[in-house]
């Protein structure tokens, strides 16, 4: 008989590779606050990969920064973001993504009047690898 895993087990499964696969969502993932009233949920968090769902209210922005080791991929679920990477600005709409190589100075902002939801996929995880820029 197959093992039935409850969604409540998702937080533990998001942090280990030995746990069986379980559904994970914002409802059962580890949550944190960042920037201008923004939210993040760790959907996957291990030593090799992180997948975070993030929420940015209208007008919010993060601090320009870079990661020495982590490459990142931002995939927009709803709304659109303005991504600045090495001084170049790109509007990224829902259903699209943008790759940020390691070492690239970048900043994501929500210039619209609508909230934005997006995924940030980092390999390796970017925690502890962030260097904020003087702006």
Which stretches of residues belong to each language-model region?
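A short, N-terminal "cap"/entry segment at the start of jelly-roll beta-barrel domains
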Residues: 1-49, 63, 129-135
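Conserved short histidine dyad/triad with adjacent acidic residue
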Residues: 35, 52-67
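Short strand-connecting beta-turns/loops that link adjacent beta-strands
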Residues: 47-49, 69, 113-114
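Glycine- and acidic-residue-biased ligand/ion/polar-headgroup-sensing regions
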Residues: 69-71, 75-81, 86
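Structural motif
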Residues: 80-82, 89, 105, 115
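Short acidic-glycine-tyrosine-enriched beta hairpin
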Residues: 87-102
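Ligand-binding loop in jelly-roll beta-barrel domains
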Residues: 102-128
